[in-house]
Amino acid sequence: MIKANLQLFAHKKGVGSTRNGRDSESKRLGVKRGDGQFVKAGNILVRQRGTKIHPGLNVGKGKDDTLFALVDGRVKFSRLGKDRKQVSIIPA
């Protein structure tokens, strides 16, 4: 009687895990309504982190610095000095 000495080996080499392969979900920040566009009260104008763009007439600011329209009207972007921007709503 012949006894077979059968040994099984891995046919693929074991590999370690990587520390890459993750990324956070985008926050969809930016200007949501353009200059001259008609908006209704409550419409979001700008989503931002910090006050890159400041609220002007008829524009409110949320706790996360989101700018939104307080009245119906047209959007108006303007500059305040050299490095400051502002968005206002001109009532229709």
UniProtKB/Swiss-Prot annotation:
Any one GO molecular function term: structural constituent of ribosome
Coiled-coil segments on the chain, per record: none
Propeptide segment residues: 1-9
Encoding gene per record: rpmA
Organism, scientific name: Acetivibrio thermocellus (strain ATCC 27405 / DSM 1237 / JCM 9322 / NBRC 103400 / NCIMB 10682 / NRRL B-4536 / VPI 7372)
Posttranslational modification: The N-terminus is cleaved by ribosomal processing cysteine protease Prp.
Gene Ontology CC: cytosolic large ribosomal subunit
The protein's name in its UniProt record: Large ribosomal subunit protein bL27
Lineage: Bacteria, Bacillati, Bacillota, Clostridia, Eubacteriales
Keywords assigned: Ribonucleoprotein, Ribosomal protein
PROSITE patterns: RIBOSOMAL_L27
HAMAP family (alphabetical): Ribosomal_bL27
Biological process, per Gene Ontology: translation
KW Repeat (keyword) present: no
Tagged with keyword Ribonucleoprotein: yes
S-S pairs: none
Gene3D superfamilies cross-referenced by the UniProt entry: 2.40.50.100
